[in-house]
Each structure stands twice: as C-alpha cells, then as structure tokens.
Amino acid sequence: MTETGERLRGLYAVTPDIPTDIEDLRARAEAVLRGGARLLQYRDKSADLPRREQAARALRALCERHGALFIVNDDVALALRVGAHGVHLGQQDMPLAEARAMLGREAIIGITCHERLDLALSAQAAGADYVAFGAVYPSPTKPGAVRAPLPLFTEARETLSIPVCAIGGIEADNAAAVIAAGADMVAVVSGVFARPDPEAEARRLAAMFEV
C-alpha cells in the first residue's frame, strides 16, 4: 500500500450537514480529533460560500494541529482555496480526472460507490485514493440510501488495492462488524457529532483500529 494509503485508516469523522454555529462546530470537531479521528471531512451543502470558507479554514487549522487529514466534500474550488488535503466526490459530482487536474497528484480523492464494486473498480482505475461504500446501516443523514452489505467489504478488500471506507449509520456500538469485514476506515457523522461527549465516542471508535 502507498504512503497515502497507510494514512487512510481509522476513524473518518464527517461534519453534519445541518446549520451549525461555526464555534460549536469547531469545538465538536476538536473534541473528535482529540479522540483520535485520523481524517475530518467538511460537508455543508446549505451555507453560503463565505461561511463555508470560514468554517473550512477553521477546521483545516484544527486538523493541522492534530496531525489529521482534512477533506472537503464535493467542492474542489473550496478545497483549493483553504489548502485541504483532498476532496470526497459523489457519483454526480465533478469527474475524478477533472478534480485531479485541478488539485494535483498529491491530493487525496475519495469516491462514493454506494453498494457497487464495479464503480469502485472504475474509480481505482481512474486514480482514486480510496472508495466509500454505504449506507452500511440505516442512516439518519441519508434515510433513503441503498444499503451496502457487509460481505461487500470483504470482497472489496480482496479485489481492490486502495483503501475502503464504510459509511452510513455507523457508531461505536456497530462499527466492529464492518471493520472485521474489511473496512480500512469508518466514516461517522452523528455517531460522534451528535453525541453528548464526541471525544469519548471518537476514542471508542479509534481504539477499534488499534487491535
């Protein structure tokens, strides 16, 4: 596995896509990073650009302080402006090749592949750094999402040479099964950010990758 691939392992925290005070978001993100998140993805589809840039810069600084990777969801231009480590793209977002041309060879680009291994193989061939499958469990973030079964992660781990991320309804009480099935990362939204003690929940999740 490449050096980038070695860094793509562990708890991958994703900010909730709901209106949130930037200081509250920053405080919760810092707690999650203290708890051991290795990556932090900023996802906000509703705020205006100035607010998103302000939040992204604050989160980027936190990641720098804690030695974590900072990823921006969808918005390649914003990722460039704030110096993010990379972007996460959905199937309907900017084509991977175009994003790579804008961000450069060193940027991390992840691709959502839902429950389809064929999409993951195509993403790998196109130069993706990781792929994400989900929803693994019922998700409050995307209640209508197609489910990705646990055996998919085992098959993906045997087939792909890039890291595999699991997303969708994951929390500390159910993450062990998908990690055992082959996920290199677990992307968690409400399972950390919506908890009374985000740091403690992040610590529980991060510890699952240390055994």
Curated annotation (Swiss-Prot):
<keyword id="KW-0479">Metal-binding</keyword>
<dbReference type="InterPro" id="IPR013785">
    <property type="entry name" value="Aldolase_TIM"/>
</dbReference>
<dbReference type="GO" id="GO:0005737">
    <property type="term" value="C:cytoplasm"/>
</dbReference>
<dbReference type="Pfam" id="PF02581">
    <property type="entry name" value="TMP-TENI"/>
</dbReference>
<dbReference type="GO" id="GO:0009229">
    <property type="term" value="P:thiamine diphosphate biosynthetic process"/>
</dbReference>
<keyword id="KW-0808">Transferase</keyword>
<feature type="binding site">
    <location>
        <position position="73"/>
    </location>
    <ligand>
        <name>4-amino-2-methyl-5-(diphosphooxymethyl)pyrimidine</name>
    </ligand>
</feature>
<dbReference type="InterPro" id="IPR022998">
    <property type="entry name" value="ThiamineP_synth_TenI"/>
</dbReference>
<comment type="similarity">
    <text>Belongs to the thiamine-phosphate synthase family.</text>
</comment>
<feature type="binding site">
    <location>
        <position position="74"/>
    </location>
    <ligand>
        <name>Mg(2+)</name>
    </ligand>
</feature>
<dbReference type="InterPro" id="IPR034291">
    <property type="entry name" value="TMP_synthase"/>
</dbReference>
<dbReference type="InterPro" id="IPR036206">
    <property type="entry name" value="ThiamineP_synth_sf"/>
</dbReference>
<feature type="binding site">
    <location>
        <begin position="189"/>
        <end position="190"/>
    </location>
    <ligand>
        <name>2-[(2R,5Z)-2-carboxy-4-methylthiazol-5(2H)-ylidene]ethyl phosphate</name>
    </ligand>
</feature>
<feature type="binding site">
    <location>
        <begin position="139"/>
        <end position="141"/>
    </location>
    <ligand>
        <name>2-[(2R,5Z)-2-carboxy-4-methylthiazol-5(2H)-ylidene]ethyl phosphate</name>
    </ligand>
</feature>
<feature type="binding site">
    <location>
        <position position="169"/>
    </location>
    <ligand>
        <name>2-[(2R,5Z)-2-carboxy-4-methylthiazol-5(2H)-ylidene]ethyl phosphate</name>
    </ligand>
</feature>
<comment type="pathway">
    <text>Cofactor biosynthesis; thiamine diphosphate biosynthesis; thiamine phosphate from 4-amino-2-methyl-5-diphosphomethylpyrimidine and 4-methyl-5-(2-phosphoethyl)-thiazole: step 1/1.</text>
</comment>
<dbReference type="GO" id="GO:0000287">
    <property type="term" value="F:magnesium ion binding"/>
</dbReference>
<keyword id="KW-0460">Magnesium</keyword>
<keyword id="KW-0784">Thiamine biosynthesis</keyword>
<feature type="binding site">
    <location>
        <begin position="41"/>
        <end position="45"/>
    </location>
    <ligand>
        <name>4-amino-2-methyl-5-(diphosphooxymethyl)pyrimidine</name>
    </ligand>
</feature>
<feature type="binding site">
    <location>
        <position position="112"/>
    </location>
    <ligand>
        <name>4-amino-2-methyl-5-(diphosphooxymethyl)pyrimidine</name>
    </ligand>
</feature>
<protein>
    <recommendedName>
        <fullName>Thiamine-phosphate synthase</fullName>
        <ecNumber>2.5.1.3</ecNumber>
    </recommendedName>
</protein>
<comment type="function">
    <text>Condenses 4-methyl-5-(beta-hydroxyethyl)thiazole monophosphate (THZ-P) and 2-methyl-4-amino-5-hydroxymethyl pyrimidine pyrophosphate (HMP-PP) to form thiamine monophosphate (TMP).</text>
</comment>
<dbReference type="GO" id="GO:0009228">
    <property type="term" value="P:thiamine biosynthetic process"/>
</dbReference>
<feature type="binding site">
    <location>
        <position position="142"/>
    </location>
    <ligand>
        <name>4-amino-2-methyl-5-(diphosphooxymethyl)pyrimidine</name>
    </ligand>
</feature>
<feature type="binding site">
    <location>
        <position position="93"/>
    </location>
    <ligand>
        <name>Mg(2+)</name>
    </ligand>
</feature>
<dbReference type="GO" id="GO:0004789">
    <property type="term" value="F:thiamine-phosphate diphosphorylase activity"/>
</dbReference>
